[in-house]
Amino acid sequence: MPRYTVHVRGEWLAVPCQDGKLTVGWLGREAVRRYMKNKPDNGGFTSVDEVQFLVHRCKGLGLLDNEDELEVALEDNEFVEVVIEGDVMSPDFIPSQPEGVFLYSKYREPEKYIALDGDSLSTEDLVNLGKGRYKIKLTSIAEKKVQQSREVIDSIIKERTVVYGITTGFGKFARTVIPANKLQELQVNLVRSHSSGVGKPLSPERCRMLLALRINVLAKGYSGISLETLKQVIEAFNASCLSYVPEKGTVGASGDLAPLSHLALGLIGEGKMWSPKSGWADAKYVLEAHGLKPIVLKPKEGLALINGTQMITSLGCEALERASAIARQADIVAALTLEVLKGTTKAFDTDIHAVRPHRGQIEVAFRFRSLLDSDHHPSEIAESHRFCDRVQDAYTLRCCPQVHGVVNDTIAFVKDIITTELNSATDNPMVFASRGETISGGNFHGEYPAKALDYLAIGVHELAAISERRIERLCNPSLSELPAFLVAEGGLNSGFMIAHCTAAALVSESKALCHPSSVDSLSTSAATEDHVSMGGWAARKALRVVEHVEQVLAIELLAACQGIEFLRPLKTTTPLEKVYDLVRSVVRPWIKDRFMAPDIEAAHRLLLDQKVWEVAAPYIEKYRMEHIPESRPLSPTAFSLESLRKNSATIPESDDL
């Protein structure tokens, strides 16, 4: 028998349907009837027939026709909203598409599994789990470690030993011993009281990352959760039942208590949850619709679910992976700009970078050579100015290896810290099964990821700062020798004038966001937790800075491609022509002014999906594998001893010299 979960004026009602031929209108009337039945005053109505209503699907808010048959219009166990005439949409009803969902592909239930052991999760793995590309299972070794850890907790309960967080209160209440008959209530109260975050909910993708990372940490076997409960958490993840987790409220020690409590709250059947099937709804109904039961917490399990740095680390993981992707592509975008501005490749000579051998600097210089080597990839644009009177380029072109290079090295440093944090036990107290005891410590403190993510924001921001200056050079006719703002009939058309302003605004905003949050601390929990990391804000603002970098480079990419239009029929190198073709597949050239924001977003999407890298990477790697000799073309302004000797041979001797 099909059944539907119907939301009417803040209440959720389970409505069974014996006949799929019944209509949407019948479902609405039956839901209203049940709603009236539960109200002492019949909800203010005298009869069901007088109530006028509309029926929406919760998923996507699609309006349903009252005459449609239920078996055609809805799926079994689907969630719907009945909006009564005169009412607005119920105030506690949350749209089923939170902000940020557009960043990733639509959810499709994955077929592949990733086995978590608590020791080997990578940043790329976690991002893919967030995107819904894998389900989760535990390794057999992880299952055994979890069971052994739980046996220690069971012994503590049996022997009535006083242990923090298991048989005592929390924080300032650490010395308050809890009676044995209230230990389960203690854990539920912990989750409820600590679910005190505010702000917008995490997107489903980010909530998946958060939940997956918490599962990985629990799989290490140092938290004392039971295998039964952990498997219930995994089942919720695999069904994509995701709790409402507000983005604000963590100070980053003792761990990310507020967001992780919201995560646990949904798992125990309270608060809101989201799934692709239901959209947002009460957690108990979302779980039930997927054949799952709310978790019944055992002693220590509430604490095991909420104590750790997983909010900081999961958001930081996304920031890190996106920073890595945009840093690679920034080299390609900058190389394209250098071609348009008729810059020289002399500054990327291997000897220059060999005497200052920072790894990132050397790699960036190599990428520029692989993309701009006109002898290997003939460039008509480069040949058009090979012999010119320009001695050297501006810093924004000449110093790309040094500026972009340190960003790459920063990302590598941060990745090492975040990868360690992904596979670290950050609970308190820690359960050591091999010793048969628990030990209180401070692994929950988020200083490591907080400091690393502050550093990431500072480092990656510089890609946008230097990109904005290159956009200025492209738009300024006195610097580019191109039409002002890269458009014909300037004055009638404004071209990239305000797109450049947008880039400047993003760079300026990021400067404020680069102020480290981890230099701040406030004492909390009655001075028990008297130093905190503020890592949650470090992670969130790192993500915002990375997004700004992507958007600024999207504008530069469009500007550089537009600049090429004014150099035609000359062509650039093969890999850069491929990048140009990629951009033109989604954004046409500007002949005159048009609505520009969608084009910026289209270019942003190319960078976000790493399409620019995918196009250029084969040429970069081929150049690397073939060990192509470096070409060093001479120009009248290039000084060398060899050229000096040649010139000396042509100077006639004179008695006066």
Swiss-Prot record:
Signal peptide: none annotated. Gene3D superfamilies: Fumarase/aspartase (Central domain), Fumarase/aspartase (N-terminal domain), Phosphatidylinositol 3-kinase Catalytic Subunit, Chain A, domain 1. The keyword Transmembrane helix does not apply. The modification Phosphothreonine is found at residues 396, 637. Pfam families: Lyase_aromatic, Par3_HAL_N_term. The modification Phosphoserine is found at residues 635, 648. One of its GO terms (molecular function) is histidine ammonia-lyase activity. Keywords: Disease variant, Histidine metabolism, Lyase, Phosphoprotein. GO terms for cellular component: cytoplasm. Pathway: Amino-acid degradation; L-histidine degradation into L-glutamate; N-formimidoyl-L-glutamate from L-histidine: step 1/3. It is an enzyme of class 4 (lyase). There is a cross-link at residues 253-255 (5-imidazolinone (Ala-Gly)). Contains an active site 4-methylidene-imidazol-5-one (MIO), which is formed autocatalytically by cyclization and dehydration of residues Ala-Ser-Gly. CDD domains: PAL-HAL. Coiled coil: none annotated. Its EC number is 4.3.1.3. It catalyses: L-histidine = trans-urocanate + NH4(+). GO terms for biological process: L-histidine catabolic process; L-histidine catabolic process to glutamate and formamide; L-histidine catabolic process to glutamate and formate. It is linked to Defects in Hal are the cause of histidinemia (His). PANTHER family: HISTIDINE AMMONIA-LYASE. Belongs to the PAL/histidase family. This is Histidine ammonia-lyase. It comes from Mus musculus (Mouse).
